[in-house]
Amino acid sequence: MFGNNRPMFGGSNLSFGSNTSSFGGQQSQQPNSLFGNSNNNNNSTSNNAQSGFGGFTSAAGSNSNSLFGNNNTQNNGAFGQSMGATQNSPFGSLNSSNASNGNTFGGSSSMGSFGGNTNNAFNNNSNSTNSPFGFNKPNTGGTLFGSQNNNSAGTSSLFGGQSTSTTGTFGNTGSSFGTGLNGNGSNIFGAGNNSQSNTTGSLFGNQQSSAFGTNNQQGSLFGQQSQNTNNAFGNQNQLGGSSFGSKPVGSGSLFGQSNNTLGNTTNNRNGLFGQMNSSNQGSSNSGLFGQNSMNSSTQGVFGQNNNQMQINGNNNNSLFGKANTFSNSASGGLFGQNNQQQGSGLFGQNSQTSGSSGLFGQNNQKQPNTFTQSNTGIGLFGQNNNQQQQSTGLFGAKPAGTTGSLFGGNSSTQPNSLFGTTNVPTSNTQSQQGNSLFGATKLTNMPFGGNPTANQSGSGNSLFGTKPASTTGSLFGNNTASTTVPSTNGLFGNNANNSTSTTNTGLFGAKPDSQSKPALGGGLFGNSNSNSSTIGQNKPVFGGTTQNTGLFGATGTNSSAVGSTGKLFGQNNNTLNVGTQNVPPVNNTTQNALLGTTAVPSLQQAPVTNEQLFSKISIPNSITNPVKATTSKVNADMKRNSSLTSAYRLAPKPLFAPSSNGDAKFQKWGKTLERSDRGSSTSNSITDPESSYLNSNDLLFDPDRRYLKHLVIKNNKNLNVINHNDDEASKVKLVTFTTESASKDDQASSSIAASKLTEKAHSPQTDLKDDHDESTPDPQSKSPNGSTSIPMIENEKISSKVPGLLSNDVTFFKNNYYISPSIETLGNKSLIELRKINNLVIGHRNYGKVEFLEPVDLLNTPLDTLCGDLVTFGPKSCSIYENCSIKPEKGEGINVRCRVTLYSCFPIDKETRKPIKNITHPLLKRSIAKLKENPVYKFESYDPVTGTYSYTIDHPVLT
């Protein structure tokens, strides 16, 4: 592994640099090392075995390989160094003597510490020994990185610089910094020496160059070739290719530097970035960036070439490559201006002549400057330059050349600047023109649309659509068509030309008028810029009838064919654009603004408003004379006839009208107590009498009215059923109140009247009246003292019909409700007495009754609403304050403890749907049990024969 004849990485004698190497390196004649150093000599007569890293040596008669590829004729060291018959050091340093031991780092007894042989402290080797990394040579020794020297007595520097004399640290020949006094020594940064040497590459592929890559006819770090190959930036070199595409013919380094073939005596060195410097004579030493000097001169850091004779005869160059002679020496500047070479620029531009390309593809032939001159080639964005030596400024200003500017300007004679300002001569000659970034064409336009000249020119397109010699519009509708002058518009519609026929319409309808009118066209806001059309006037969006209308109806001028359009607010402007005019315009064309503003020839022309938009607004003549309100006289007859009632109906209803019910038998305070008649009657009053009594609003105006006694007397003709022929019978009084002072005659008459009433009670008419008039006793006469006569028998008869009614002071209503005490009794009580009414009973003859067991307060309760309104009965049910929103609290009003008795509360048989009256029926017992379990009511009694159910409740009003 560390000294066998077979390589480690499996290469069959060709590991890394041959046609069958592991990493695909290919060569035609000679194998390559890892770093592309080709070690081929005229004296190699044996098969060269290759190491693992591609380095080989051509020691005669021996093909043994080490780990790092050193081919030695003798035993191999640990790192592949070749040793004759000597012992190896730990790092394989080989000594040239047969009995000497290797030192620590592989240096021989007369060598340096890093593997260089005897000559120099920095590894200059004069014997045929190998460096630690396996670079081998028959007569010369390699340095630390394997650079070798072709001289039999030559030495190698640390980075592979080779010269005929002693090499410095960085490969310079002569002193450490390469400055020769009378000779042609190289400086520290790669100025080459004039001595001829073989074409072996250093670490970066430089052949006999300094540390920074000055090379003679071989590839640099980025593959710059001296003849025709291409480097990383497209320069074509004739030799092999690097990893960036440059392919040398011979062996290449890691980055594609080509090491020249045998027999080449011209040292052509390349720079760091692949600049190639070729020369026909002598050794051309290159600088850091590949500048070439013709003679044996010293170059600066950036490869500047100085051909004049300086002190001690040296040709010294300046810092940026400016040559100090007037000879034909070709040297490249800082940005890659190169002479006498053929290559492509960074982006692939190709040059016609033998000039190299700069950073942006500028191709310079002979005398390039830093920023200006350039040769024919392709620019950054693809512009073609086909003329001879032309120099272009930073923004594309180029005098009389075909080179385009940075932003795409291309012209044969007159280039364009950044904003399109053209550097034109004073004469009005025709020329081809290029376009700037914003489309301003040269020869005519200023940066903002000014028109300097009226020369004829070609056409070009801009970014915003400005195109001369065409009929297309730009983004904002500016048309730049012209037959004589390019009609280019500014960014905001400024027309910076002298064209006579521009017919396109802008985005908002701004249209430059011309001699030829379009048929139709209206702006977005109704801007119509044509004064005449073939179809008719164009209406704006707001209904304006004028031709050229702005946003608010302002119209442009219609005076000439100069094409004036309306602005946003109707201002008319007949002046030119904001650009400075150097030449008077041919035709006075007005300019178009962004929103269609129009120029007006004079300020005396009054603005025209839109009739449709402001037709409804009355504009006063002045502020001091406002429009006054119109007044009209009112006729006296109209004033007299007008009244407050004219706003109402001709026959309005009265607010409070009495009830028109004639069927009511008993009325109190204009209020009928009959619920059926009250429900069916029609009242003209706005307010309901019932609601008025519920709210007690009537008592507000007449508080003593309630205590007045009202007597309603009606003549009942049906009572005269008994015809008496004598005068005595005619004098009989129906109802009298007997007193102790009454005479016997009065007692006799009273007994007769009682007997007659008994007969009348059994008559059919009396029975008929029982159904209708039992609740309204009809007094027919008065006593001498004026008291009312009440038939007591009637009360007894009615009381006998109502079960459980003990008192005779009862008032019955036609809806079968009754109340006790009667309404008359309750009405005669004072306010204090109404606050405590005992034994109040409200009932229905068919459904049941309610007996209040505690005194009730009827002061705030309307009496006629107790029966049927506040207390309602139904089959097997009784409810109090059911339909009222305002309910009394517990213990107030009638919300006190009471006993409720319901009639006919029989359970219903589900099969027959009939009440169960059998006292032994099981459902009856079950129904009684449910009644007892009711938690709200307290069960008292149930009569199964009559079906009377009685219970008590503490607070009957359910809140």
Curated annotation (Swiss-Prot):
Bias (Low complexity) ranges: 37-48, 56-81, 92-104, 121-136, 154-172, 259-293, 304-317, 336-352
Sorted alphabetically, the Gene Ontology BP terms of this entry are: membraneless organelle assembly; mRNA export from nucleus; mRNA export from nucleus in response to heat stress; NLS-bearing protein import into nucleus; nucleocytoplasmic transport; positive regulation of DNA-templated transcription; post-transcriptional tethering of RNA polymerase II gene DNA at nuclear periphery; protein import into nucleus
List residue spans for each GLFG repeat. Answer: 77-80, 112-115, 168-171, 271-274, 287-290, 300-303, 333-336, 345-348, 358-361, 379-382, 393-396, 490-493, 506-509, 523-526, 550-553
Q: Gene3D superfamilies attached here?
A: Peptidase S59, nucleoporin
List the cysteine pairs that form cystine: none
Domain note: Contains FG repeats. FG repeats are interaction sites for karyopherins (importins, exportins) and form probably an affinity gradient, guiding the transport proteins unidirectionally with their cargo through the NPC. FG repeat regions are highly flexible and lack ordered secondary structure. The overall conservation of FG repeats regarding exact sequence, spacing, and repeat unit length is limited.
Describe its assembly. Answer: Component of the nuclear pore complex (NPC). NPC constitutes the exclusive means of nucleocytoplasmic transport. NPCs allow the passive diffusion of ions and small molecules and the active, nuclear transport receptor-mediated bidirectional transport of macromolecules such as proteins, RNAs, ribonucleoparticles (RNPs), and ribosomal subunits across the nuclear envelope. Due to its 8-fold rotational symmetry, all subunits are present with 8 copies or multiples thereof. Through its FG repeats NUP100 interacts with numerous karyopherins including KAP95, and MEX67.
Q: Where is the composition biased (Polar residues)?
A: 12-36, 137-153, 192-245, 294-303, 353-377, 679-697, 777-790
Q: Record the organism.
A: Saccharomyces cerevisiae (strain ATCC 204508 / S288c)
Query: Which is an annotated Pfam family here?
Result: Nucleoporin_FG
Please, what other remarks does the record include? Present with 358 molecules/cell in log phase SD medium.
Q: Point out the gene that encodes the protein.
A: NUP100
Swiss-Prot/TrEMBL SLFG repeat ranges: 21-24, 33-36, 51-54, 66-69, 89-92, 131-134, 157-160, 175-178, 202-205, 210-213, 220-223, 242-245, 253-256, 318-321, 405-408, 417-420, 436-439, 462-465, 474-477
Q: Which UniProt keywords apply?
A: Membrane, mRNA transport, Nuclear pore complex, Nucleus, Phosphoprotein, Protein transport, Repeat, Translocation, Transport
Explain the purpose of this protein.
Functions as a component of the nuclear pore complex (NPC). NPC components, collectively referred to as nucleoporins (NUPs), can play the role of both NPC structural components and of docking or interaction partners for transiently associated nuclear transport factors. Active directional transport is assured by both, a Phe-Gly (FG) repeat affinity gradient for these transport factors across the NPC and a transport cofactor concentration gradient across the nuclear envelope (GSP1 and GSP2 GTPases associated predominantly with GTP in the nucleus, with GDP in the cytoplasm).
Q: Where is this region: Disordered?
A: 1-104, 121-172, 190-394, 672-697, 745-794
Name of the featured protein: Nucleoporin NUP100/NSP100
Q: Which family does it belong to?
A: Belongs to the nucleoporin GLFG family.
